[in-house]
Structures are given as C-alpha cells and as structure tokens.
Amino acid sequence: MNPLKVLTISSVSIWLGAMAFFSIFVAPAAFTVLDRESAGRLVTTVFPRYYLFGASLGVVGLIGVIGQFFGSGGRQALWGTLALLLLMLGLTLYAMLVLEPQIQSTRLALRSAGIAPGSGVAEAQAFARLHRISVILNGVTLLAGLALIGLEAIRSRG
C-alpha cells in the first residue's frame, strides 16, 4: 500500500479514535464522577487541546492526500477523500477558533452571574445552543471521518 495513503488513513483513524474516546467515555464520565462545575472546568481545559490534536492530524492527512495526488503525476485524484478531509478540518477549525471561544465567554458570563447552565435564563439558553452546535459539529466530523475510511477501504479493493 502507498505510504502516503497509510499516512492519511492512519491520521484520520487516530483522530476518530481520540474523538470517540473523549466523546463516549471521558466527557460523560467527568460529568458522572465530578460535580458539574469541576467537570465543566475539566472539559474546558481539554477542548482546546482536543481541537488542536484533531486539526494537526487533519493537516497530516491532507499532506498524505496531496502527496498521493502529486506522486501519481496528477493521475490519482482523490476528490472524495479530499472533500471529506477538508470538511473534517474545516469543522474542527471552526469549532476551535470560533465556537469554543464563544462557549468559553458564555460559560464565564454564566459563572460570574451565578446562573446555572440548565436554567431558562437567556445566557443559559445561549450556552445550550452553542453546546448543541458543538455536539452536532463533532458528530458530523466523526461521520465524515468514518465515511473517509470507508471510501478508502472501497478504493483499496479497486
């Protein structure tokens, strides 16, 4: 198998594994074991690193796809893989650079005003909306990664 293809598949697979582990195990466990405030602080601390890790792996995967294209003299256009990887990377960068700072500022406003995140107050509703968007983007990124791995598996069968 082409080493650049291995690089792309490996980086996306590691990314998916990290996403699944954090989303399915770490975050829910934090909110089960810790009080809401402590769990929120833990997740707040992890998320910037989570997004940076994903974006870094996305760039590595992108290097693999671009390398495959140029290594084949342009004969091997991996448009589906490229589109899915760019979608994953774009959503992750948006979450990291735009959404996460908004969530943090909303969380700080809630904390400083003494408002509980689950209450019906406007700030709490804003936080819930931003959190919902974050969960959706994470889910779409995960599904795009699974589709990318599936597409590459189909292409390998040739």
Model-derived regions: residue spans:
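Polytopic transmembrane helical bundles with strong interfacial aromatic enrichment
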Residues: M1-G158
